[in-house]
């Protein structure tokens, strides 16, 4: 995910995780649902490394687009959480196929990032405040 256009990076990252789920199902189950005796929280460690890398890439993109780089860690957590939780769901479902799931997850991530506001705020409840 180090090179290429931003959307392609997202797609490759999502496909990589789903391919791991598909090809190393037992390993993913161990990582996602527990750990081997005597070992630490392996899945958490892997996700933390992935999140750090994604956050670093997002900081670059945010700087390029004039967004707050300090928030890249939050968005990295959100993106990795979206992808990893969807992978857990797909582990049990396996329908739709991997490429369809990856396309939909990438669509959500890409279009959500593409339309980001520089100063987001909560709109829910504003009508109640005005009343």
Whereabouts are the PLM-identified features?
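Amphipathic alpha-helical packing segments from all-alpha helical-bundle domains
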Residues: 11-15, 19-20, 38-63, 73-88, ...
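Short, charged, surface-exposed loops that flank catalytic or proteolytic processing sites
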Residues: 5, 96-101
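Secondary-structure edge/capping motif, primarily at the C-terminal ends of alpha-helices
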Residues: 1, 28-35, 61-62, 86, ...
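Short, charged helix-capping/linker segments at alpha-helix termini
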Residues: 66-70
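Short, hydrophobic secondary-structure boundary micro-motifs
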Residues: 28-32, 40, 120-122
């Amino acid at each position: 995910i180090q090179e290429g256009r931003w959307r392609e990076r997202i797609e490759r990252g999502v496909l990589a995780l789903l391919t791991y789920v598909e090809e190393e199902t037992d390993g993913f189950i161990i990582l996602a649902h527990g750990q081997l005796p005597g070992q630490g929280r392996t899945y958490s460690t892997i996700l933390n490394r992935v999140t750090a890398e994604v956050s670093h890439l997002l900081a670059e993109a945010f700087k390029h687009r004039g967004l707050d780089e300090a928030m890249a860690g939050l968005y990295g957590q959100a993106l990795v959480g979206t992808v990893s939780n969807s992978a857990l769901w797909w582990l049990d479902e396996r329908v739709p196929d991997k490429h369809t799931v990856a396309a939909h997850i990438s669509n959500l991530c890409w279009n959500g990032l593409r339309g980001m506001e520089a100063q987001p705020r909560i709109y829910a409840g504003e009508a109640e405040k005005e009343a």
